[in-house]
Each structure stands twice: as C-alpha cells, then as structure tokens.
Amino acid sequence: MKTIKNGVYPTMITPFTDDNKVDYDGILQLLDWYKYRGVDGIFAICQSSEIFYLSFEERLEILKFIMANKPEGMDIVASGHTADDLETQIKEARAFIETGIDAYVFISNRFAKEDESDEVLLKNMKYVAAAL
C-alpha cells in the first residue's frame, strides 16, 4: 500500500434493493455522486457500510465492484475484518488488500475481547499487522 493523499474521505453506505440484495446500480450512483462533489477518496467498506450484517463474500464482492468502477484518481479505503479469530481476520484483511485498495483500516475492537487486557489487544494487533 501507499500513503494516501490528504483530503476528504466520506464513509460509503451500502445501498440495498427492495428485496434486500446489494444494489449495484445504487453503488454506481454513489460513486458518481462522490466524484462530482470532488472527494479525494471514499471509505468504502466500513461500519457505515453494514459490514457486520454482510458475509465476507458479500463484502469482498462489493469492494471488487467498487475497485472496478471507481472514478479515476479516487482513493479507496476499506476495512472489514469482522471475524472473532485472528487467522480469519488476517485472511479477510489480506483479501481486501489484494483488491488494490489504497489503504486498509484496522477495527481495533476486533483484536481483543471486552474482558481482555490492553496487552492482549496490542499483541494481537502486532501479530495481524506482521502477517499482512
């Protein structure tokens, strides 16, 4: 990955059709909307995108679609390692990074359970970062 440019990076929602499927035409409209407002990039796969309600396969498919249709010059930032275990988090993060995104954002609360110490969080975060 590279250093992303300074600028505006709004979070992107995931639009759905009336029958609760991902609305890919809606995603195209959102990409155009962001383009014409001059944003520097979008945070495409994030909590605003309903990542905890989508399967890994759905999140990855959406991200690949966004990467294939993003406006020229627009940076794409993503997240989405929602699994409880670290090995699956690594697999998920690696798959998102391999789409060619410009930056990946870790979800810090996925690295330790609520009753675990800060030391566990830091150890797990370093482990995942080193694996990527």
Predicted region positions:
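Active-site beta->alpha loop and helix N-cap motifs at the rims of alpha/beta catalytic domains
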Residues: 2-132
